[in-house]
Curated annotation (Swiss-Prot):
Belongs to the TrhO family. Keywords: Oxidoreductase, tRNA processing. The gene is trhO. Residues 132-226 form the Rhodanese domain. The active site is at C186. PROSITE patterns: RHODANESE_3. This is tRNA uridine(34) hydroxylase. InterPro entries: Rhodanese-like_dom, Rhodanese-like_dom_sf, TrhO, TRHO_N. SMART domains: RHOD. The keyword Iron-sulfur does not apply.
Length: 299
């Protein structure tokens, strides 16, 4: 049976998440859904999967149930299909932030940073500047191991290990951003939106977020100006610019990304180890995910 995968997020002030949690969990369990829903004072972030009739019912529920006071009435969802259920259980969690930056929570009522859509961004990159003539700098807000799977050509990559490091590296590298148009990007939009809001809040000018992230860019314009694939936080590991799963896998032991060529190594034992963590290896660098870094999101 085909499984429908849904992802969505929104920065919006929420005051009743403690009351919502058991009700949302009960509805998801009744529908037979699995996945993760994060609720925080600054908004919602979710990735769920199930049969078509169940996911359609959930979309109708969250958009129209009076419980949510219309806060998600136009919530956009990203949808993909898979041959199996990628999640083991259904979790609804309360968090301080829907994506952890360890800074004061985003106040959505103060407005979001401007966004740029995929086609406009491609045009800017084609011509080498934005419509005002400023050079365009792509800023990767993802973790280093994700960047290693693929990123935009000549993107700034500060090799962060977790998103909470982002404010410090931006402060240390402000000179890289002066006089330029900055486009922050991530997998599906949530990190680059929060990153853009933070940069705007600390006085950095001409900052945009890539609307819908890398995956929306792939959907709209393909892989132009992008090198490699896009890491995703689910069983698929990585998607190519055609949004098809690649041959990359995630190591069961250390969560490193193991490309197809590394899977031919005698140090790769499915379900046990890979060249990055094999006990007999001297320490081959791996594209390693931080355990529990974040739930699957925005794909």
């Amino acid at each position: 049976m085909t499984t429908v995968n849904l992802a969505a997020y929104r920065f919006v002030s929420l005051d009743s998440i403690e009351q919502w949690r058991p009700l949302v969990a009960a509805r998801c369990n009744t529908l037979g859904l699995r996945g993760t829903i994060l609720l925080a004072p600054e908004g919602i972030n979710l990735f769920i999967a199930g049969p078509r009739e169940a996911t359609d019912a959930f979309v109708d529920y969250i958009r129209h149930d009076p419980l949510f006071e219309g806060k998600f009435a136009d919530l956009p969802f990203k949808e993909s299909l898979s041959d199996s259920q990628p999640f083991r259980r259904m979790l609804v969690r309360l968090k301080r932030e829907i994506i952890t930056m360890k800074k004061p929570a985003i106040k959505p009522e103060l407005g979001r940073a401007p966004s740029v859509d995929a086609r406009t961004l491609k045009a800017w990159l084609d011509q080498g500047h934005d419509d005002a003539g400023r050079p365009v700098v792509m800023l990767d807000t993802r973790n280093a191991f994700e960047v290693d799977v693929g990123t935009f050509d000549r993107a700034l990559d500060y090799r962060i290990d977790k998103f909470s490091e982002f404010p410090a590296v931006i402060e240390a590298n402000r000179a890289d951003l002066e006089g330029k148009t900055i486009v922050s990007f991530c997998t599906g939009g949530i990190r680059c939106e929060k990153a853009a809001i933070h940069m705007k809040d600390v006085g950095i000018e001409n900052v945009y977020q890539l609307e819908g992230g890398i995956l929306k860019y792939f959907e709209e314009v393909g892989g132009a100006h992008y090198h490699g694939d896009c890491f995703v936080f689910d069983y698929r590991t990585a998607l190519n610019p055609q949004l098809a799963p690649t041959a990359d896998v995630t190591c069961f032991a250390c969560r490193a990304v193991v490309p197809a060529d590394a899977q031919q190594s005698p140090l790769y034992v499915p379900g046990k180890c890979c060249p990055a963590c094999h006990p007999g290896d001297s320490g081959t660098p791996g594209r390693r995910a931080e355990p529990g870094a974040e739930p699957a999101r925005a794909v």
